Amino acid sequence: MTDSSTSHPLDLRAWLDEARALGELTDVSGADWNLELGAISELNVKKERPAALLFDDIPDYPQGHRVLTCSTASPARLSSILRVGHQPTHRALVETLRGKPKQWQAHAHEYDPVTAASGPVFDNVQTGGDVDLFSFPAPLWHEKDGGRYIGTGCMVVTKDLDSEWINVGTYRVMIHDRNHVGLDMIPGKHGAIQYDKHMKAGKPFPVAIVIGCDPLGYLISGIEVPFGMCEYNYIGAILKKPVSVVKGQLTDLPFPSASEIVIEGYAHPGDVRIEGPFGEFHGYYPGKAETAPVVTIERIYYRNNPIIMGSPPAKPPNDYSYSKAVMRSALLVDALQAAGVPDVAGVWRMRSAARACSTWCRSVSAMRDTRGRRDTFSASAAWAHTCRAIRSWSTRTSIRRIFRR
């Protein structure tokens, strides 16, 4: 089925125009991919009303090769992303979302993605020896990270071995070299289940990683949908319109036709490398660097002047803790009322509690900083580096503008 006129390409640039019109987007010029982007983003999201940040003029890269952070971190932007009308306050947004996830899930089967013949994502194609992940300003987000993470606000597209189930999940993606990335998937996650099935069968695991599209894509790929359901269907139910996808030339996996960057390849049986450590959502470096699947990248597709969607974790509040808190607050209100709890005036699940306790308990026993102590990491080291390193007048001016808001 091909009908792009009635489908949605998940175009990030269309959403950026909307965010700018709302007064919710700030341009930052001259920040370095090496720690500065991460430190500025972390300090920004600690504000009461943080703007989305669009970084350009990044050292070592052509003008127009950009990075976006903090996309979901305000009620105005999140309500825009979820297509629920302008909601100016946390409480209004939570109330508006009550019952919505159940509705979206119930109608998801009506919105199979629509395959388009082509799309802007194919403006440029790297193949073979031309593949170079360092063509893009993937940040080193935290000082002690194991490498540059091109995938934080990403969508990892995979397929089941023995069915037609397409899964779209968010897993961190670290660059090893010009054509290899590490893919960290927590055991039990749907992508990890599909990966394990391929490995047990001795077959290569096809992967397409979307590095930037409408934030709705990243938002839904990072939540829990029922086993066997494709996230594209869920997104379509929110949009009330199918997602427009194109097929990868290598793997035939579907990805949004207006994606900014897509890297495509295979994880081969037995091919693992050390990945991490990485400063995570609870404000710690959990555990130590460990082996993770390696994806050999054989194709890169990207738009002219591509934009990386970044979502760097940090001690809450962080880049995505607001969206998690809002979504889970809405679910909690519904659960309380369904349980017969009277006189519920409102619910707010704290951002520091926006992840499951099981995740926290599993991680906390192994949390160490790189000096061997149990301790938090924060932006302090990165920010100290930033203060030393920022020499550009334009960058300093951009930062002052951010923190006057």
Where does each model-flagged region fall?
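Extended, highly charged
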Residues: T2-R405
